[in-house]
Amino acid sequence: MNKQPEDWLDDVPENIDEEDDEIIWVSKSEIKRDAEALKDLGVELVELGKNALERIPLDEDLRAAIDLAQKIKKEGRRRQLQLIGKMLRARDVEPIQTALDKLKNRHNQQVSLFHKLEALRDRLVEEGDDAIPPILALYPEADRQQLRSLVRNAQKEKAANKPPKAYRQIFQYLRDLAETAE
């Protein structure tokens, strides 16, 4: 057997613990997971529409690759998505991820606002004039007379089993009020 000379200990640096702290070992599996996450981010970007894609900070090469991937079908699309993932690995994806999260959050906020407005509309139709003051407190620019007439029409339509035209008009009016309040 080959024995190492006793002086091999002299080659070991004294601050070995400090060097270990500086070296960050990343497993191959973690690298693959990160690459897959970036590829999934690329898929999300490709599935976005043109208007949403314009709001995301992308350089020209990446934008061109995404535009091309949106046009390609089948196997070529898979390869293009892999290329987009590779391009994302070479870039700082934090601003892209932040912009994408804002787009998703905006959609969720809009859905919750619509649910809130639907509940207000249902309350207006059920309670009638008694439900108008809280809405006026919430939206001071609301027209009390218009709200009352829409509510009366919706109640008449409901009693006569007619299509809910005024019901939809109440929702549109509340949505317009919410948009102007923002």
From Swiss-Prot:
Cited CDD domains: YjgA-like
UniProt subcellular location: Cytoplasm
One GO molecular function term of this record is: ribosome binding
Q: Does the keyword RNA-binding apply?
A: yes
Instruction: Give the UniProt record's GO annotations in the biological process aspect.
Output: assembly of large subunit precursor of preribosome
Q: Which GO terms describe its cellular component?
A: cytosol
Q: Which UniProt keywords apply?
A: Cytoplasm, Ribosome biogenesis, RNA-binding, rRNA-binding
Pfam families documented for this protein: DarP
User: Superkingdom, according to UniProt?
Assistant: Bacteria
Q: Which PANTHER family match?
A: UPF0307 PROTEIN YJGA
Give the protein family. Answer: Belongs to the DarP family.
Q: Main role?
A: Member of a network of 50S ribosomal subunit biogenesis factors which assembles along the 30S-50S interface, preventing incorrect 23S rRNA structures from forming. Promotes peptidyl transferase center (PTC) maturation.
Protein name from the UniProt record: Dual-action ribosomal maturation protein DarP
What is the native source organism of this protein? Serratia proteamaculans (strain 568)
